[in-house]
A protein has these predicted regions:
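An intracellular "coupling" helix at the cytosolic face of ABC transporter transmembrane type-1 domains
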Residues: 9, 97, 114-122, 175, ...
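Transmembrane helix-loop-helix hairpins at lipid-water interfaces of multipass membrane proteins
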Residues: 9-65, 144-151, 263
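A hydrophobic transmembrane-helix motif
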Residues: 24-37, 128-169, 225-271
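Juxtamembrane helix-loop junctions of ABC transporter transmembrane domains
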Residues: 29-37, 58-101, 105, 124, ...
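Hydrophobic alpha-helical segments in the permease module
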Residues: 54-66, 159, 237-244, 263-285
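Juxtamembrane loop-to-helix connectors within ABC transporter transmembrane domains
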Residues: 93-138
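Cytosolic ends of transmembrane helices, especially the final helix of ABC transmembrane type-1 domains
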Residues: 231, 276-313
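Helix-to-loop junction immediately C-terminal to a conserved catalytic motif
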Residues: 374
Length: 535
């Protein structure tokens, strides 16, 4: 019951209350059976007086504690789900970007949705697990008062049923784990179906091959694995019922004379075993949910291990930006296919009010260098030197806050985290310059819309970066998908405006027409600097 121990640490006393209420309800249920069986032997004159009142009170206790147990478990299910979501999303937000890239979005989303929903279903099924378990225990205790020998037969039936269940349990668990791993791939494939929707509609053969082949095969594999797993659990449940009826028949028709059982004892025995069939099936049918919850918790724990939070951070010294240098920086990227790319060793320096262009062909390492510069990738060796001091690992968060960036695969927010000393007049001027004044308004730190074309969204991302007013700006091929008019605005008006404010601008670009505007050009080839000279 390691799952319950983990959950108990999360919710503490509430879980204990729900468990105790469920056990009381189950034992009350079993006590009602004992009262019913006992009432059959009472004299006619006494049957409806004291025992009737006791029966009513016991029934009320059973119902009240059942309601308490069920509602508490439902409440706890949602509480645990919300708590884990908060903890995991906070951990995702605090994990190094490199670790998040390696882990992948699909696995994280799957844990935050499907696995946490599995835990909620588990909580909903817990009342029956404890209530039925208590009913079974209470029935066995009552059975012991009737006949120890029959109790031994009952325990033998339960033990034999447990062995059959355990034989199926290991195989079923393995199938459920495999299906959960396949569902991660299935989420990726469904995302691919949406992300590549336009291209698929332009290539019907590709679409049909993907939907009818790769996607359908994975859906079928998930179905088969889950079906086999749950069928095994179903067979185990049926095996328990078969054994119960077999032992009822054995006692009634095979061992009755050998055990010298009285008719009242046989009646009580049969009633107890018939009464226990539903609880036993209920407990066994709840076990797959317990197994799924165990798998879900394992995946939650694995996600926590895969996304370790960054070490505790300290703020940077309160001083203006004076210089940034990369000294013998080296970084090796390893792809999923086993291929690697090495950037460096690199040496470069940046100063306030400087405009630097980084150029190079595809695969030369420009984007990797950009991630290193802004602190998203940690270097394997070398040092980042800020204002003459090597940057420590516990200063990374503060270092990243020096940058505003527009990446090539940028994300556009509809709000600005913090607007500095920009005036409404300046914002409106830039909106007009970017020809967005008729589509977007900016008020109270928020844009009125982000539902724009890709080029317009990129212009809005530039405006957002400008509003943050950081000392360093990184633009990763910002002008690549802009028409000549906005390229000219970017190079001839916006970059000089930022430079005049004393900002350091690092722009990855292929626009050789504007190379003369840079103070310095750094050219990369195969991860090495082949040119770094002022113009």
């Amino acid at each position: 019951m390691s799952v319950l121990l983990v959950l108990f640490r999360m919710v503490g006393g509430w879980l204990l209350l729900a468990v105790v209420a469920g056990l009381i309800s189950g034992f009350s249920n079993a006590s009602l059976l004992a009262m019913i069986n006992h009432s059959l032997t009472l004299p006619q004159t006494d049957r409806w007086l004291g025992p009737g009142v006791q029966f009513a009170l016991l029934a009320l206790l059973m119902l009240a504690t059942r309601v308490i147990s069920q509602t508490t478990f439902m409440y706890l299910g949602q509480k645990v789900k919300a708590r884990l979501r908060v903890e995991l999303t906070r951990q995702v937000s605090e994990t190094r970007w490199l670790q998040l890239e390696k882990s992948g979005m699909s696995k994280t989303i799957s844990v935050l949705t499907q696995d946490l929903d599995t835990l909620v279903v588990f909580f909903v099924s817990l009342p029956n697990l404890f209530i039925y378990g208590a009913v079974i225990a209470g029935c066995l205790v009552y059975l012991a008062t009737l006949s120890v020998s029959v109790l031994g037969l009952a325990l033998a039936a339960i033990a034999l049923g447990s062995l059959g269940y355990r034989a199926a349990h290991g195989r079923a668990m393995g199938l459920l784990r495999q299906s959960r791993l396949r569902e991660d791939t299935l989420i990726q494939q469904c995302k691919k179906l949406f992300d590549g929707g336009r291209e698929y509609r332009l290539n019907a053969d590709r679409r049909r091959r993907f939907v009818a082949g790769e996607l359908a095969d994975n859906i079928e594999a998930v179905r088969q694995q889950r079906t086999r797993g749950y069928v095994l659990y179903g067979l185990a449940t049926s095996w328990g019922s078969i054994l119960f009826f077999a032992f009822i028949g054995l006692v009634l028709f095979g061992l009755r004379d050998l055990l010298t059982l009285e008719p009242a004892t046989i009646t009580g025995y049969v009633m107890i075993f018939l009464y226990m069939i539903v609880p036993v099936e209920g407990v066994l049918s709840s076990l797959p949910t317990l197994a799924s919850a165990r798998v879900a918790l394992q995946r939650v724990q694995q996600l926590r291990e895969d996304l370790p939070p960054e070490q505790t951070q300290r703020p940077l010294p309160a001083e203006p930006f004076r210089s940034l240098a990369l000294e013998a920086i080296r970084y090796q990227y390893r792809g999923e296919d086993g291929e690697s790319f090495t950037l460096g060793p690199l040496d470069m320096r940046f100063s306030p009010g400087e405009l630097v262009f980084i150029v190079g062909g595809n695969g030369s390492g420009k984007t990797t260098l950009a991630n290193l510069l802004v602190g998203l990738y940690p270097p394997d060796s070398g040092a980042i030197v800020l204002n003459g001091r090597a940057l420590a690992g516990d200063r990374q968060e503060g270092y990243r806050q020096l940058f505003s960036a527009v990446f090539n695969d940028f994300f556009l927010f509809d709000d600005v985290a913090f607007v500095h000393e920009r005036t409404a007049e300046q914002v409106n001027h830039l909106l007009r310059l970017l020809k967005l004044q008729h589509k977007v308004r900016f008020a109270e730190g928020r844009f009125s819309t982000t539902a724009l074309s890709q080029g317009q969204r990129k212009r809005l991302a530039l405006l957002q970066a400008w509003l943050e007013e950081r000392p360093l700006y990184l633009f990763d091929e910002w002008a690549a998908d802009q028409d000549p008019e906005f390229k000219a605005v970017f190079y001839l008006e916006l970059l000089p405006m930022l430079k005049a404010e004393g900002k350091t601008i690092i722009a990855i670009t292929h626009d050789d027409r504007y190379f003369h505007l840079a103070d310095r050009i750094i050219k990369l080839e195969s991860g090495r600097i082949v040119q770094s000279a002022p113009l």
